[in-house]
């Protein structure tokens, strides 16, 4: 059975029972606008024209391009930490980047002591391997830095 049929079959059979069973992984439905990009692991998928929708079955690190930061734009403490965690997430390799992460974390704590709760929440997510959740927390700090720099 092709992948897309398996995805629809697994979702349909789960919902016909009225609920998702514990431990069932539901495929991720992704919609892309024309020419929008999405990063899956180390690959970038580019929508070539019309609006599309597809399912991703399995576990893979996924980020929309608008949620990524590159080395050139990582010019603040929060952005440097975000880039480091983003790299850990997309490459699925926490140990390799742990030393850099700890340095960026220390820098952010020193420059932004008022954000301790958010920084600690992000750090707790990294400690448990929940890197996507850590990115969501760090995004709050990036947004706050951008607001302060714009003022």
Across the structure, where does each feature detected by a protein language model lie?
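Terminal leader/tail segments of proteins
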Residues: 2-151
């Amino acid at each position: 059975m092709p992948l897309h049929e398996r995805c629809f079959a697994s979702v349909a059979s789960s919902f016909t029972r009225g609920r998702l069973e514990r431990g069932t992984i539901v495929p991720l439905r992704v919609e892309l606008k024309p020419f929008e990009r999405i990063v899956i692991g180390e690959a970038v998928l580019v929508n070539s024209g019309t609006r599309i929708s597809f399912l991703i079955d399995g576990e893979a690190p996924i980020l929309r391009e608008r949620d990524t930061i590159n080395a050139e734009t990582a010019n603040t403490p929060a952005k440097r930490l975000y880039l480091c965690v983003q790299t850990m997430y997309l490459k699925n390799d926490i140990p390799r980047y742990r030393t850099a992460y700890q340095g960026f974390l220390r820098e952010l704590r020193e420059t932004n002591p008022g954000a301790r709760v958010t920084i600690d929440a992000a750090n707790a997510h990294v400690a448990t391997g929940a890197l996507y959740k850590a990115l969501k927390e760090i995004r709050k700090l990036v947004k706050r830095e951008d607001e302060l720099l714009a003022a």
